């Protein structure tokens, strides 16, 4: 570059070394400013109210709603065993052994932590007879795995046979409390390496549950009114709702809004992620392939805890009142009682971002179309018999609760309820400032990368993403700062 500058007639022939150094310094500074101007401020510190109970729950008597919250909080962190002790029933297949190992950032009930607890399971006694899948890393996201399609007997992918069920990472093989189910031959892990090679594998990360009770208590009619208001938007966005198959009501939890309620969300997770049968999912769950072939789980791996089925149920003779509940009810009450995250300041490169910058970023976020899906406040809750903080309360979730086509770039080719292979629920953005892993599969920790991923063939968000790309670097940074303030 120096020789080019010295010989370039635009610089008057030979340029002296001092002038050349100045030019190079200026170029470096310009590049540094350009890089700085579009940088994710990163995960923000502090709690921002996450992990706390709703005000009316905290203010209740120790024997009232506060007791249910505290009981659920404790059970959410219980470590499950296969057999023996009060908290048995784990497995025979599982992804983790406690709710809080997946829902931990920045507090119990949140999203996946910075250090992945799954990575230690083969060495710390949780899953000693297992092989650690290559995609599980120490500082990567906590995940569940699905194969979008079934495999043929010859090992090829059958594109005409949709699968999409969870393939649990670990088995109880090798554990001292696994009883008769203690052979890798009897209970092998899924073929993760083959699925990776065939590109027939997708990942999901945990969704945070802060403020979930408010989302649950949004009336269907409120959501439908919001949808109607957006029918004539200028951004090519046309979302829909996933519905509960039994009563046709709007479902709203999970990456594809596949779960109607927090109770169903809890029951499914207990069964799928930890292998614990309950009043909603009453049997130990085989892998999708075992279910398809009709083989089911080996008899030697059934009822390992000795409780019979379901393994989790109510205890009418329990005392105090909260202890009467089954774990699934305790989990759902805990999540229903969690306060939503509060917006906060943003620190970037050691400097406090101004409130004006954050406000400007919020206005830009709306003007370019982001708020069409990420609705700042989709409505007020209806009356609640659970606790007064859930009644007539605003829900600043930054979501319309609708499912949208996100294109082939984000598609996971898994259908759940009315949500197709490239459809996902608009992820609520409250608490984004403290979220580490982004998008449904945790593929990135960088907001810029996540925003760019919204544009691909078939995505409803492509126009909005293009609007973002057309902003100046300063304006893009203002939006990033705003997002990390949530």
Residue ranges and their predicted role:
Residues 11-12, 483:
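Short hotspots in intrinsically disordered terminal tails
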Residues 12-13, 409:
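Residue-identity detector for glycine
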Residues 35-486:
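Periplasmic c-type cytochrome electron-transfer domains
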Residues 2-3:
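Basic polycationic patches enriched in arginine
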Residues 23-33:
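Bacterial N-terminal signal peptides
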Residues 6, 13-24:
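Bacterial N-terminal signal peptides that target proteins for export
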């Amino acid at each position: 570059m120096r020789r080019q500058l010295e010989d370039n007639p635009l610089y008057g022939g030979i340029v002296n070394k001092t002038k050349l150094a100045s030019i190079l310094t200026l170029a470096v500074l310009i590049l540094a400013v350009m890089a700085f101007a579009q940088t994710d401020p990163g995960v923000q510190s502090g709690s921002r109210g996450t992990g706390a109970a709703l005000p009316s729950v905290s203010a209740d008597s120790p024997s009232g709603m506060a007791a249910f919250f505290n009981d659920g909080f404790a059970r959410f962190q219980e470590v499950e065993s296969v057999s023996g002790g009060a908290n048995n029933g784990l497995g025979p297949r599982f992804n983790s052994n406690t709710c809080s190992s997946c829902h931990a950032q920045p507090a119990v009930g949140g999203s996946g932590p910075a250090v992945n607890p799954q990575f230690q399971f083969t060495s710390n006694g949780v899953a000693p007879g297992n092989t650690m899948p290559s995609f599980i890393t120490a500082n990567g996201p906590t995940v569940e795995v699905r194969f979008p399609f079934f495999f043929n007997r010859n090992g090829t992918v059958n594109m005409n046979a949709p699968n999409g069920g969870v393939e649990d990472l670990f088995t109880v093989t090798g554990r001292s409390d696994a009883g008769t189910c203690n052979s890798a031959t009897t209970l092998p892990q899924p073929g993760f390496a083959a699925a990776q090679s065939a590109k027939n594998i997708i990942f999901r990360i945990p969704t945070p549950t802060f403020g979930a009770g408010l989302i649950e208590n949004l009336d269907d009619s409120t959501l439908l009114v919001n949808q109607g208001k957006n029918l004539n938007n200028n951004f090519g966005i046309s979302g829909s709702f996933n519905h509960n198959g039994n009563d046709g009501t709007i479902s709203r939890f999970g990456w594809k809004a596949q779960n109607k309620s927090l109770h169903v969300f809890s029951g499914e997770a207990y069964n799928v992620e930890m292998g614990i049968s309950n009043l909603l999912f009453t049997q130990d769950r085989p892998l999708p392939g075992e279910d398809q072939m009709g083989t089911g789980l080996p008899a030697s791996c059934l009822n390992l805890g000795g409780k019979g089925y379901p393994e989790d149920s109510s205890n009418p003779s329990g005392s105090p009142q909260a202890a009467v509940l089954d774990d699934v009810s305790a989990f759902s009450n805990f999540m229903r009682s969690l306060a939503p995250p509060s917006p906060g300041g943003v620190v970037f490169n050691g400097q406090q971002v101004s409130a004006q910058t954050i406000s400007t970023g919020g206005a830009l976020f709306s003007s370019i179309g982001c708020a069409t899906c990420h609705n700042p406040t989709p409505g007020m809750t209806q009356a609640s018999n659970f606790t007064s903080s859930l009644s007539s309360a605003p829900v600043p979730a930054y979501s319309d609760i609708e499912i949208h086509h996100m294109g082939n770039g984000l598609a996971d080719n898994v259908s759940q309820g009315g949500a197709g292979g490239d459809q996902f629920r608009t992820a609520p953005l409250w608490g984004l400032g403290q979220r580490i892993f982004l998008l449904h599969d945790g593929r990135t920790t960088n907001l810029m990368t996540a925003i760019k991923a919204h544009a691909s063939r078939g995505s409803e968000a492509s126009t909005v993403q293009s609007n973002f790309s057309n902003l100046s670097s300063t304006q893009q940074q203002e939006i990033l700062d705003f997002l990390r303030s949530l």
